[in-house]
Amino acid sequence: MSSPTSIADLRKSYERAELNEDASHADPLNQFDQWLNEAISAQVPEPNAMTLATVASNLRPSTRVVLIKGFDAQGIVWYTNYASRKGLELAGNPYAALQFHWVELERVVRIEGVVEKVSDEESDAYFHSRPLDSRIGAWASPQSEVISGRGVLLANAAKFGAKFMLQPPRPAHWGGYRLKPDNWQFWQGRKSRLHDRLRYTLQGDAGWLRERLAP
């Protein structure tokens, strides 16, 4: 197997911005809010996309990309099928990690913490705000299960569309999760691979400890 350019030779010099303690927020949530809004303003493709890492009971990790749907002092929220692989792994081990990578801004945000389900009221409110096709899709897809072909999904969508018409209820197996952060890291690419990297660690009632890490 060969390619015109060696993968080992692919590299980029990061020179867009810097991340200094004096200019960063003392609260990581405020720093995240600033960076996310800057990614949106810069029209970064899907700035709300984040990688979610979970670990199974056999200690085997897995990742997938999900979309952030909200955040506040309580944590980071996304929605999914509770019976999916990630849902089953979170049921057995509630610790998880998230990562945002905004390539165009040469920035990465990493978040670690414990995950819990959001309330039924929150899940209901978000579910009913979704487009009709997406709500039907939550019923149609037995997420992470083996299926014989795409026709299974299309048949399920037709079946549930006919059953629920314009008012599908939220499936009991579908809803939201909230990761409650206890560790944040903000990475800003810099020249010569001497990147800026700030870590925030929760110190109980004392709040957040901000430290610079070597890249």
UniProtKB/Swiss-Prot annotation:
PANTHER family: PYRIDOXINE-5'-PHOSPHATE OXIDASE, PYRIDOXINE-5-PHOSPHATE OXIDASE. SUPFAM superfamilies: FMN-binding split barrel (SSF50475). Belongs to the pyridoxamine 5'-phosphate oxidase family. Homodimer. Its EC number is 1.4.3.5. It catalyses: pyridoxamine 5'-phosphate + O2 + H2O = pyridoxal 5'-phosphate + H2O2 + NH4(+); pyridoxine 5'-phosphate + O2 = pyridoxal 5'-phosphate + H2O2. The lineage of its organism: Bacteria, Pseudomonadati, Pseudomonadota, Betaproteobacteria, Burkholderiales. Pfam families: PNP_phzG_C, PNPOx_N. Keywords: Flavoprotein, FMN, Oxidoreductase, Pyridoxine biosynthesis. The gene is pdxH. InterPro entries: Pyridox_Oxase, Pyridox_Oxase_N, Pyridoxamine_oxidase_dimer_C, Split_barrel_FMN-bd. Binds 1 FMN per subunit. NCBIfam families: pdxH (TIGR00558), PRK05679.1 (NF004231). Pathway: Cofactor metabolism; pyridoxal 5'-phosphate salvage; pyridoxal 5'-phosphate from pyridoxamine 5'-phosphate: step 1/1; Cofactor metabolism; pyridoxal 5'-phosphate salvage; pyridoxal 5'-phosphate from pyridoxine 5'-phosphate: step 1/1. It is an enzyme of class 1 (oxidoreductase). FMN binds at residues 64-69, 79-80, 85-86, 143-144, 187, 197. This is Pyridoxine/pyridoxamine 5'-phosphate oxidase. Substrate binds at residues 11-14, 69, 126, 130, 134, 193-195. GO terms for molecular function: FMN binding; pyridoxamine phosphate oxidase activity. Catalyzes the oxidation of either pyridoxine 5'-phosphate (PNP) or pyridoxamine 5'-phosphate (PMP) into pyridoxal 5'-phosphate (PLP). GO terms for biological process: pyridoxine biosynthetic process.
